[in-house]
Amino acid sequence: MQQRELNYLFLKRIGINTHQEPVVYMRQDCHVCRSEGFNAHSRVRVTTNKRSIIATVHQVTDGWLSHQEAGLSDAAWRLLEAEDGEVAYFSHTKAVDSMSHVRGKLYGASLTQESADEVVKDVAGGLYSDVQLAAFVTACAGSRLNQDEVAALTSAMVKVGQRIDWGTSPIMDKHCVGGLPGNRTTPIVVAIVTACGLRMPKTSSRAITSPAGTADTMETMAPVNLTLAQMKKVVEQEGGCIAWGGSVSLSPADDVLIRIERALDLDSEGQLVASVISKKVAAGSTHVLIDIPIGMTAKVRSPEYAERLASHMRYTGVKLGIQVEAMFTDGAQPVGRGIGPALEARDILAVLRNQAEAPADLRVRALTLAGRLLEIGGVASHGAGVARARETLESGAALHKFMAICEAQGGFREPALAPHCYEATADRVGVVSFVNNRFVAKLAKLAGAPSNSSAGVDFHVKLGQKVRVGEPLFSIYAEAPGELAYALDFLRDHPNEIRIEEESL
């Protein structure tokens, strides 16, 4: 009898969320661990009649698993497409040869195109453990990648994912580097640009550390989980879409690396550029506008860093054959009023519907970005883009196009707000002098956003605005009293993150 035929266990779903890391749970004294010499954190190949994955071993010492069972984390279960009681075979994995490039980078070697290809291929293939992934992320953190290394990493990321060919040019796109709550211009921009005859198939992300991503916000108004075939049908019909990028495998290695970056709380200039540009190239974009908000509590805190980031993006775009342009914007305070999926969607609709109460700052930002894209795309002359965008918005053409896109994606619905609300008011007379973007984002998340799409924070004031005692500053919306209580506890513990100063005479 072959060894493989002995090394089998029956699979059991145990309902543990390991944050996308495939983990297999085995009795320490089961026959497979003993015969193969598996230890805690061993990397093993798990094979069924349908699929094969690599997972990390966690060993169990008590009786909640039998000696004949192997438990799978949610991530492993999903990747393996397993069924309860299904037979799986276990074996050692080969050493990951590309780790030599990671070690080399840690000791000062450069990342070549060949080494980047090997590392990224293994990352996307699930060969790296979280420890090995952390080593690679650390090796590339900060400003440790030069422009050619960034371009090599970006190219490698594109190679391991799907790449969409729309069969025409130009294909317009935009991206915001983030860090600014409420800056949800994308649905407005897509509506304006496509209403003017350009193609803009927008794949957007869900929130990672923010209270809402564009996909989360759009999902409160229309379905966003589109297959590639569905995306192409919507774009063919309407000229654009606003879909969740995770539903098509555009840059699978990037999704893995982002998870590790967030866990380590590491910002990598090079990996940020590679992440953005790889997904734009894979999405088939030819002309990309990057929105870089600058502010002391935004992701990008200085004009110098913004310019360096923009330079990296332009250089990498040229290397990969797309046109990239950057636009620097004000990141001193949240944009619009709503922070959280449904609240941001409400602001978007107010702008598209030309309502009097629509947030002026969100409207101006969207018109500025859309106007520049119209110029880049050749449907407006230089300097005339904003006027063309404004005309498209005010005529109702942008709203009509947005509704058509929603219907093509599965149907439009009005976003709903959470039932529990607390209104924070000013405790003094003065002028709003400071708003901490990170505090506002954390407050919205504690209220339940983005998992509860109707939760979040609704701002009533802007920097420089005069307020009186008792005047509303912002409202917190939550689905449950407990979530509202979490947010209020945080608010009480951080009293100076929104400051009011006496007006100078």
Swiss-Prot record:
InterPro entries: Glycosyl_Trfase_fam3 (IPR000312), Glycosyl_Trfase_fam3_N_dom (IPR017459), Glycosyl_Trfase_fam3_N_dom_sf (IPR036320), Nuc_phospho_transferase (IPR035902), PYNP-like_C_sf (IPR036566), PYNP_C (IPR013102), Pyrmidine_PPase_CS (IPR017872), Thym_Pase_Put (IPR028579)
Enzyme category, top tier: transferase
Keywords: Glycosyltransferase, Transferase
Listed GO biological process terms: pyrimidine nucleobase metabolic process; pyrimidine nucleoside metabolic process
Gene Ontology CC terms, in alphabetical order: cytosol
Name by which UniProt lists this protein: Putative thymidine phosphorylase
Pfam families with a match to the protein in the record: Glycos_trans_3N, Glycos_transf_3, PYNP_C
GO molecular function: 1,4-alpha-oligoglucan phosphorylase activity; thymidine phosphorylase activity
EC annotation from Swiss-Prot or TrEMBL: 2.4.2.4
Keyword Glycosyltransferase: yes
Record has Transferase as a keyword: yes
Family recorded in the similarity comment: Belongs to the thymidine/pyrimidine-nucleoside phosphorylase family. Type 2 subfamily.
Taxonomic superkingdom: Bacteria
Reaction equations catalysed: thymidine + phosphate = 2-deoxy-alpha-D-ribose 1-phosphate + thymine
